[in-house]
Amino acid sequence: MARYLGPKLKLSRREGTDLFLKSGVRAIDSKCKLESAPGQHGARKPRLSEYGLQLREKQKVRRIYGVLEKQFRNYYKEAARLKGNTGENLLQLLETRLDNVVYRMGFGATRAESRQLVSHKSIMVNGRVVNIPSFKVSANDVVSIREKSRTQARIKAALEVAAQREKPTWVEVDSAKMEGAFKRIPERSDLSAEINEQLIVELYSK
């Protein structure tokens, strides 16, 4: 399945919530009607079946983290093998992706931009260049911007925007040095309450 390259706001309207695919401090509900379907005169969304709700939740989370279907299913399988709550394990695995950590630290304005920074070899983990967006970051790993990439305007702009947002408690960032520490794996209470991971577990358990 190919990665979606179309309008980002359309995806958020389809899911009925801000997927954080656009940069900026304001939520996008001020720009578009999230309760309506995509399109200039989008009708209100029909009531979904139980399966429809489960599928929609999976699509929403997959799009938030920018993960393709096969990869997302693999994350679920890994989450199911781990001890504890499968849904919570799934979200924690997604949060440890390098592209997501780069975004959480504010080096990229969006996860898509952060993924690009990783792919273009602008990111280092513990002093070594890593260009795999799905690379798993561990607690206490240090993530930094490569020296030759520190003059990029988009990184500076992203850090300025990030300075206006509430910073995640599980990362520690030194904006001047353009580096941060991944202090710990986030708890479920740290993450968005708008995600209902149990629906995803129910979908894949069928």
Swiss-Prot record:
GO cellular component terms, semicolon-separated: small ribosomal subunit
Tagged with keyword Ribonucleoprotein: yes
Keyword Ribonucleoprotein: yes
Gene Ontology MF term list: rRNA binding; structural constituent of ribosome
Keywords: Ribonucleoprotein, Ribosomal protein, RNA-binding, rRNA-binding
Stored HAMAP family: Ribosomal_uS4_B (MF_01306_B)
Record's subunit section: Part of the 30S ribosomal subunit. Contacts protein S5. The interaction surface between S4 and S5 is involved in control of translational fidelity.
Protein name listed in UniProt: Small ribosomal subunit protein uS4
Originating species: Shewanella sp. (strain ANA-3)
Lineage: Bacteria, Pseudomonadati, Pseudomonadota, Gammaproteobacteria, Alteromonadales
